Swiss-Prot record:
Name of this chain's protein: Peroxisomal membrane protein PEX24
Domain of life: Eukaryota
GO BP terms: peroxisome organization
Biological source species: Ogataea parapolymorpha (strain ATCC 26012 / BCRC 20466 / JCM 22074 / NRRL Y-7560 / DL-1)
Primary role: With PEX32, contributes to tethering of peroxisomes to the endoplasmic reticulum for organelle biogenesis, positioning and segregation.
Localization of this protein: Peroxisome membrane; Endoplasmic reticulum membrane
Gene: PEX24
Pfam hit, one: Pex24p
GO cellular component: endoplasmic reticulum membrane; peroxisomal membrane
Entry's family note: Belongs to the PEX28-32 family. Peroxin-28 subfamily.
Key words of the record: Endoplasmic reticulum, Glycoprotein, Membrane, Peroxisome, Transmembrane, Transmembrane helix
First and last residue of the signal peptide: none
Length: 569
């Protein structure tokens, strides 16, 4: 950002004294902001870079208001904002926005009052300030977690448009039952968790044996309600457009993956990022902030009324951007906690815990269906909401202390141990399922040295064997892969795919043979080999006899390593 404000009269010729003071104050704020940013660039001060872009919008807004309306005392106070910023709880942008609203003529406008109330809200003051880098990272993270929302959206569209008549009729039947028996609306979510989360995760951990059946061509309609399916021209055209769109998206994604195989690892959700990830975030934040604030600065040119209306719209835009940023942060935290809870409790990571949840959900469904007509649901809903709201009262701790009894009735030690022993018996489960392993092959591709033909150097780790029949090798292209095995990730179906291979610790495999040609790494969830669904990563050495064009044939793998196991940290 240049040190001159974005005004056509920045040269200073023909300006009044208050306007000159205004320009000097704005320049002073800019210089202090830039000096503060440069002094903090080496550490955590990188987060303060958001004020540079925000200051551009504020300068444009102050200029459009008219600096003649501000007094010298106001400019002195604005000059001191950057110094008081780290000591005051009120954000830098909020202070400037309040001064901006004070400079606008007093009129009975509901939008102005609403903006003031939002700025002075104590809950809003406690939230983080506006940061283009943060909001861009939130949108990127949120877009990767919206699969469930999008699948729900398309499911609703399929139900309404009769794309799947059986699904539409099932929805109508379930909705009718829910209207006749309202307590079933509590059963439906539990039933979805049971059939849509628990059972698929169990089948993934314990796959069923598929019988060898000769495949035959499907005859007739796939559903008995096929005559209800709509096959008009509009529907066929919509399906054709969706198919072309999906193919185009796959082609674009494949091209992006070819170009950004290694750089994609900088996409992370953590706040404490490395230098490469931080560079990626700053670069994307700068490009997005330029687009956003360019639209803010050009808004005056598009509006017919360049006075007070344009200023209010700009202030409202900044406030809404900050609220949207904090809203997306809360949504991401909530979705992350939900995913972690589902993975810990319902993915059969711990067989006993997930099995207990399975039986508890079945018992809850049966009890609700059988005893549902006799349960006072209205009283339960009323009391539940009242209790939840009262528990959020600021003086709840004082009230709860008064309600607690002064002396607690404690059981004797013998009775206490007996109760614990009976409770532990009720929760005992025996899981006798044999361990099952899935193999993931990672090929260690090596190059032959030109000077010493007997020496091979590591080239990369790849998911493709890169043999003579490989498409890339036929086209005389380099294989796709990663130079370091620590960057290799598990597939998404492996559960917690955030753990990389390099984060596993090796332990000896006493039962394995010493003459195998694969290096096997087994991923267990709890640190030992009792998990029924472990991951085996097989690393097979592939040696290339030519380093330039990969024209010659592969030599046989002579890599016979000691088998090791790797378990999750």
């Amino acid at each position: 950002m240049s040190n001159s404000p974005p005004s056509s009269s920045s040269s200073g010729k023909g300006l009044s004294i208050p306007r000159k003071l205004a320009l000097n104050a704005i320049n002073e704020i800019q210089n202090r902001s830039n000096d503060y940013l440069l002094s903090k660039r080496g550490g955590k001060g990188l987060e303060e870079g958001r004020k540079r872009a925000a200051l551009a919008a504020v300068i444009s807004t102050v200029s459009s208001v008219g600096a003649d309306r501000l007094t010298k005392a106001d400019f002195d106070e604005l000059r001191d904002l950057s110094e008081q910023e780290s000591h005051d709880k009120v954000h830098f942008m909020d202070k400037l926005t309040n001064k901006l609203l004070d400079a606008i003529p007093r009129r009975s406008d509901e939008s102005m009052d609403e903006l003031r109330k939002r700025l002075e809200d104590r809950h809003r003051v406690e939230q983080p300030g506006l940061s283009i880098k943060r909001i861009s990272r939130n949108f990127k993270t949120l877009s990767s977690k919206m699969d469930l929302v999008f699948s729900l959206q398309y499911s609703i569209i399929h139900v309404i448009s009769w794309d799947k008549p059986s699904l539409t009729l099932t929805f109508l039947i379930l909705y009718t039952w829910g209207c006749l028996m309202p307590y079933l609306f509590l059963v439906y979510p539990v039933f979805y968790v049971l059939t849509g989360v628990l059972i698929p995760n169990y089948l993934y951990r314990h796959p069923l044996a598929k019988p060898d059946i000769i495949p035959t061509r499907a005859r007739g309609d796939s559903s008995i309600f096929g005559f209800l399916r709509t096959e008009n021209a509009w529907e066929l055209d919509r399906q054709r457009i969706l198919l072309e769109r999906s193919r185009t998206l796959e082609r674009i994604l494949s091209q992006e993956l070819e170009l950004s195989t290694i750089s994609s690892r900088t996409s992370t959700d953590s706040e404490d990022e490395g230098s490469s990830s931080l560079f990626y975030e700053v670069f994307t934040a700068d490009s997005k902030s330029n687009l956003v604030f360019k639209a803010v600065l050009e808004e005056d040119e598009e509006t017919t009324e360049k006075g007070r209306t344009g200023v209010v719209d700009k202030v409202k835009l900044l406030i809404n951007m900050r609220d949207l940023q904090n809203l997306t942060s809360d949504i991401i935290k909530m979705m992350t906690r939900m995913q972690d809870s589902i993975y810990e409790n319902y993915s059969f990571k711990d067989e006993k815990r997930s099995t207990k949840h399975f039986f508890n959900l079945i018992a809850l469904i049966l009890i609700t269906i059988v005893l549902g007509p006799y349960i006072p649901w209205r009283a339960i809903f009323i009391i539940t909401v009242w209790v939840l709201i009262l528990l959020k009262h600021p003086n709840r701790q004082h009230i709860l202390k008064q309600l607690k009894p002064a002396t607690k009735h404690k059981l004797p030690p013998k009775h206490r141990t007996e109760v614990k022993r009976r409770a532990s018996r009720l929760g005992e489960l025996i899981v006798d399922d044999p361990p099952q392993y899935r193999t993931i092959q990672i090929y260690q591709i090596e190059k032959q040295d030109l000077i010493k033909p007997s020496v091979y150097e590591l080239y990369m780790y790849s998911s493709s064997i890169f043999n003579e029949s490989d498409t890339l090798r036929i086209q005389k292209k380099d294989p796709r892969g990663l130079p370091i095995s620590h960057w290799c990730k598990l597939p998404a179906q492996a559960g917690n795919s955030r753990k990389r291979i390099g984060q596993w610790t090796p332990i000896r495999d006493p039962g394995a043979s010493k003459t195998v040609s694969w290096m096997r790494w087994r991923l267990t969830e709890s640190g030992h080999m009792t998990s029924p669904a472990s991951i085996v990563v097989a690393v097979l050495c592939v040696r290339l006899s030519d380093t330039a064009g990969h024209q010659k044939s592969d030599r046989g793998s002579t890599m016979i390593p000691e088998p090791v196991r790797r378990k999750a940290v």
